[in-house]
Amino acid sequence: MEPIILASSSPRRQEILKMLGIPFQVIMPNVNEAIASRIAPNNTTELLAREKIIDVLHTLPSNQKIPWVLSADTIVTKNSKIYGKPKNQEEAERFIKEFQGATHTVITSVALYNGKTRTTTTKTVETKVTFAPMTSEEIKWYIDTGEWHGAAGGYRIQSLASLFISKIEGSQSCVTGLPIYELYDMLKEQGYSVLESFE
């Protein structure tokens, strides 16, 4: 099975590739996310996912054979406002206060570069997440866990935040940052067999 370059530093995305038995190496892209600040949220993630691939391709030696590059980008949005990764504890607390007792949307785009065809394909997934009403003590407790560090929207659905999430409409793996079905479908369309790793 051919190795994939993962253009992401996300531990969760790495865990998903390991679970699927896909060999990969990580190259962290250097993309200015401010370039997407003036476009619609559902276009933001696709643009950034593509930019991450372009950045990684430019860092590789020109004579290096590049079979596959995979990237993804996730944003959280509510009432047309985008919630990125909180800069500090106060911002993380504000995010959770705005999410509690309400529904927001998580958008993840996956981009896959095929080195044989030199083309990039993308898929975008949206999932609605509803937080139950939370007390100030619950919000403080969650923020004090530190899970908000490095997480879009300031929470991790696959961990302790799940205590307060009452409803998910759509793909849970979209919320964790790499929609598994869409990834599998893209790889299959491009002739990359994930199933080989289990034979």
Predicted feature residues:
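Cofactor-binding loop segments of dinucleotide-utilizing enzymes, especially the Rossmann-like FAD-
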Residues: 9, 29, 115
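A short local structural element in Rossmann-fold oxidoreductases
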Residues: 18, 36, 140
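N-terminal beta1-alpha1 ligand-phosphate binding loop
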Residues: 2-22
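Anionic-ligand binding patches
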Residues: 2-5, 40-199
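Short glycine-rich, Thr/Ser-proximal phosphate-binding strand/loop in the N-terminal lobe
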Residues: 21-38, 120-126
